[in-house]
């Protein structure tokens, strides 16, 4: 019932993740934690979250992506047969201090899961996003997740765990489409002098 004096989240993922606390996204850049082979190394991020916590219920929200661990388009390099291939796995620990008391927990089967509006994602092929599958308020403290599925314990990855001291991957420019074609697959046309990009849109 008391807001802690300090609170840290330590987090890594075999693919990519995005992190929200009480509906506020605090992810350390794009493609977090970083692109790596989870059989060799995994970078972990640490977040100071105490200013985002409040009295009563709080919510940690995660969105996971395939990254290197499930590179669907990597068959040219036999990534489809890689020993580390799997759905993205996450490891998270929370530690808060309030006076002389300490609260600690880790991500386990009490965390709950559901499919996201991202219906396809690949390290090299981008993602398909279906906005009709969005779930309002899913990362807020008052959301009812009783219909969601409990997380599954997946074991420990073999890669060495390293603190993430890499440069953040950030968005430097956003492009607006200049034309959209109707059809089964709707390519989006960007201005000239830009590498060709195709985006599948769902309404």
Where do the PLM segments sit?
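Accessory beta-strand-rich segments of carbohydrate-active enzymes
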Residues: 1-137
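Activation corresponds to long, low-complexity, non-globular regions
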Residues: 101-203
